Amino acid sequence: VPETWDXXDYGAQT
């Protein structure tokens, strides 16, 4: 999981 993972709106990992 990326460090900027909140729920699915961050990076590009849906």
Curated annotation (Swiss-Prot):
Subunit structure comment from the entry: Dimer of two small subunits linked by disulfide bonds.
Species of origin: Bromelia plumieri
Keywords assigned: Disulfide bond, Hydrolase, Protease, Thiol protease
Entry keyword Hydrolase: yes
Record-given protein name: Karatasin
Name of the top EC class for this enzyme: hydrolase
EC number of the protein: 3.4.22.-
Record GO terms (molecular function): cysteine-type peptidase activity
GO BP annotations listed: proteolysis
Keyword Transmembrane helix: no
Family membership: Belongs to the peptidase C1 family.
